[in-house]
Amino acid sequence: MKNIFVVLILLFTLALKAQNKIYQPEREKINNLVHTKLKVDFNFAKSQLNGEAWITLTPHFYPTNKVTLDAKAFKINEVKVNNIIAAYNYSDNELTIELNKTYSKGEEYTVYVNYIARPEEVTQKGSENIKEAKGLYFIDPLEEDPEKPTQIWTQGETEASSCWFPTIDAPNQKTSQEIFMTVPSKFVTLSNGTLQSQIENNNGTRTDYWKMDQKHAPYLFFIGAGEFSVVNDTWNGKKVDYYVEPEYE
């Protein structure tokens, strides 16, 4: 009887703990992402990203005449909808844009945002497992530490990609992507999808174009750049590349 009483107390305690857990529903869908195109380059002196974003969306169900994008610690320079200057409000890390008309479900529109991302000014906190949530990380950007390689890379889980590009930063959104990334010519880049082209510029930089047609959540967007060596391998007939620092090649 005593054992039964102890078990009942334990079950009651577990039930109370379960009730105290915060229910986290998925974000309400008002607009759906369709495609995201980005052009980015980097201000190493300030650890900032200069960006242009073309975001194609469509209403989820009900007609709408506005869209709200997550954009954390940005400086917004210009906003357009379908190539027309648009009114907007930027506050509390959200960019709310007035559309040029009311759009219905299935009707697409494209928002253009010219911006500066400032990850060092992001105030949001990370999770228990991922302590920081800056989204974009500059490693020794001024090349001051001979023991550290200069690198740029991102970590978007779960809602930190909006620290470096405007988006609906929710795991229940899906979008295809294109990224044009301009970096010092000595850098190797990596992103989602496949490398489509590389163009050498006349100022010591190179622009790499990465494209991924398969739709995925915004937190899975990735860019990386640094002085990497690429080690080629295969597995079960599939190409596998390893991006490593040169001394580990």
What are these regions (language model features)?
Residues 1-24:
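Bacterial Sec-dependent N-terminal signal peptides
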Residues 18-249:
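Acidic/His-enriched low-complexity segments
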